[in-house]
Amino acid sequence: MTQAAEHITVLLHEAVEGLAIKPDGIYVDGTFGRGGHSRLILQHLGPNGRLIAIDRDPQAIAEAAKIQDPRFEIVHGPFSGIVSYLDERGLLGKVDGFLLDLGVSSPQLDDAERGFSFMKDGPLDMRMDPTSGQSAAQWLARADVDDIAWVLKTFGEERFAKKIARAIVHDRVTEPYVRTRQLAEMIARVNPSKEKGKHAATRSFQAIRIYINSELDEIETALNGALQALAPEGRLSVISFHSLEDRLVKHFIRKHEKGPEVPRGIPLTEAQLAGGRKLKSVGKALKPSEHEVTENSRSRSSVLRVAQRLAE
């Protein structure tokens, strides 16, 4: 394993403050990573508080094992499994706060062997959990032009998706794409777009990573699971890093603030209408401060949204 840079947790204090932690509350950190949020949550908890952390990355699980605290528990798996994890523990509907820090972490990006970054050469893997599922190289070796182009367009909003997809399928006949630099250099050659401050392969690498890890489906499942997990007045605190993630989170909160669509003409009282609302936004969406962006450039695109569970 190559040496990874120390992970700087983005919007650390803001995300944890959004949980409005009760000393004896029950909390879930759905993305343990390197433990920045979890460690701060534990500092706010009293002796009877409880924190369950989740991560599907074996390296994160190894880091979590260093926390020797009876209030803390780590679960190895995707955060989309929140309902089953809590059901096993008899905690559905009893959680006071659920935190998600989406996307890929700095240690994952900086470790060339994980295959997430086009800046360092490594095997073209991109799996959050390298022990499960197909790697990016395996998928690119089998997918057809239309499938590859759809992924690049849908998850990367890549304007030249078809051109890149055709090049991948053409080239793999003689030399399959198995290294990150190999793929990044090809994309830079065939992609005429020159976005300021952005490598030509940025959108494609993001798209492939999202697809390989089913990231948007995972997020949607986890958000729906949060509705079952949270107690009345429980908080949902979510940090996203690109427009696709943030759009999903924003629309989810708005949908459950409004409640179900009711056809015109059906006589319902204000109380009955309010009964269908499951969430309310807490404050406005937050971006990192200029100081944080200066200290950690990867925080630039992050957005924090907080919502509170309403009683039904």
UniProtKB/Swiss-Prot annotation:
Q: Does the keyword Mitochondrion apply?
A: no
Leader sequence segment: none
| Record GO cellular component, one term | cytoplasm
Please give the catalytic activity noted in the UniProt record: cytidine(1402) in 16S rRNA + S-adenosyl-L-methionine = N(4)-methylcytidine(1402) in 16S rRNA + S-adenosyl-L-homocysteine + H(+)
GO biological processes: rRNA base methylation
The protein's predominant localisation is cytoplasm
Name of the coding gene: rsmH
Which residues are recorded as binding S-adenosyl-L-methionine?
35-37, 55, 101, 108
Ranges for region Disordered? 285-306
Q: Which residues form a coiled coil?
A: none
Purpose = Specifically methylates the N4 position of cytidine in position 1402 (C1402) of 16S rRNA.
Q: What is its EC number?
A: 2.1.1.199
Where does the record say this protein resides?
Cytoplasm
Source species: Aeromonas salmonicida (strain A449)
Q: What is this protein called?
A: Ribosomal RNA small subunit methyltransferase H
Instruction: Tell me a Gene Ontology molecular-function term this record carries.
Output: rRNA (cytosine-N4-)-methyltransferase activity
